[in-house]
Amino acid sequence: MAHSTAGDRDPEVGSEQHSSIAQLHTESMSDPWGDSNSPENPLNWPAPKKNFHVAIVSIFTLTANLAATMFAPGAPQLAKEFNITNSTVEAMTVSLYVLGFAFGPLLLAPLSELYGRLIIYNACNAVYIAFTVGCAFSTNVSMFLVFRFLCGCAASGPMSIGGGTVADITPQEERGKAMALFAMGPLLGPVLGPIIGGYVSQYTNWRWTFRIILIMSGIIGLATMFFMRETNAAVLLRRKAKRSPKDAEGMELELDKTKKETPSQVLVRAITRPFKMLLFSPIVLLISLYTGVLFGLIFLLFTTFPTVFQGVYGFDEGTSGLAYLGLGIGMFLGLVVFSILSDKLLGQKQGGTVSKPEQRLILMKWFGPITPLGCFMYGWSAYHHVHWIVPILGTSIIGFGSLFVVIPGQIYLVDSFGAEAAASALAANLLVRSPFGAFLGLVAAPLYDRLSLGWGNSVLGFITLAFTPVPWLFYRYGETLRTRFVVKL
């Protein structure tokens, strides 16, 4: 029975929630799958099949985040075409998409835990394609803003439930690499977007950025529709019970629980999950705030790059776009280090005993504190007109450190709540993180006008420095907090 569900792989999940699947294992004498090695159980899938599903959701997430900033270089063209003179409205043509990341998961993540991941992936992709077409053929700014926001809501689907898919098919001790690949989308996508979008806008126009996104989304959508399979264990077991009366007898606990609630009650309970997690779990709240600050910092830096590398260092428009690669290289190096160390450290710390989610915070403790150093290096080197390689190295340090906050933070939430509630935990994280990405960039101009690049980035460095004790706190007291502040889902 060790391979029956993700809940079995997550010993700490029981302290967080009353999982129907966990109840099934402890209270029923029979394995709900009929066989602990059943091929129907996603945890028992062959490695190539698991890797394919991780790759698809990771590419889906990367594409969704590419679209967040790929349009940004073309925003001035849209502003000119639609006669936009208000700088805030122009900024909203980019930021509203990211704001959609906060609202979409509130419905999509709970629905995936009730009705399955696959139907949400397919529905989100179809809706996303439709709204992307709307963006590409918009005839006025109001039409564009509405479609842009709705695109963000649809794009949030894979970001909020992808972690659930990873948890569905990978045991805890193998989850680090898979989650690292999945979590790279929100980090690397916004970095690569402006580079690609800059050349697309330069040689075509802003509408072509959406046509390229449309092509990419169509390919991913077809792959999802024809090759992906459902991974949610609870949904698969319910379907199994409906197919076979014999299986239904072994699932009486789960079925009886479901029958006590109407569909609307089940949906309301599921939708309120992310809010309950934020309100009653200090772990979810502080991890979400920490990742939100880092996510917002990255988007804020994007607004300064044209000013710094064109205004201070004299880069042309095309070359200045390559400055974004500093962040990207730092994140890529961080990904390599994380992939090598994450699961290895978990195994070493386990030492034959029960592993704990807090062991995922070790790398955050080690590398998170270097992010403020990158802020200071970037800001003051640009302020004093030091050679351009120095501020780019500063952004690389920011990218490296940010990765070791965002990815371990997400894995910690997934390991803490298990496959049954991973999507809701990540939805809570997105609910906090996305507004930082959407709106923090709007304060860049007044911040730097008043404080200069040096002190402005120092303020950002001090803010990130204030959050560095968070992983140390949870590494020491996380298990106690999870036991004391139990979120009844």
From Swiss-Prot:
GO molecular function term, any single one: transmembrane transporter activity
Bias kind Polar residues: ranges: 16-41
Transmembrane regions listed in the UniProt entry: 52-72, 91-111, 127-147, 149-169, 180-200, 208-228, 282-302, 321-341, 361-381, 388-408, 425-445, 454-474
Membrane in keyword set: yes
Pfam families noted in UniProt: MFS_1 (PF07690)
One cellular component term from this protein's GO annotations in UniProt: plasma membrane
Protein function: MFS-type efflux pump involved in the modulation susceptibility to various compounds including cumyl hydroperoxide, potassium superoxide, many singlet oxygen-generating compounds (eosin Y, rose Bengal, hematoporphyrin, methylene blue, and cercosporin), and the cell wall biosynthesis inhibitor Congo red. Involved in oxidative stress tolerance, colonization, and lesion formation.
Protein name: MFS-type transporter MFS19
Source organism (scientific name): Alternaria alternata
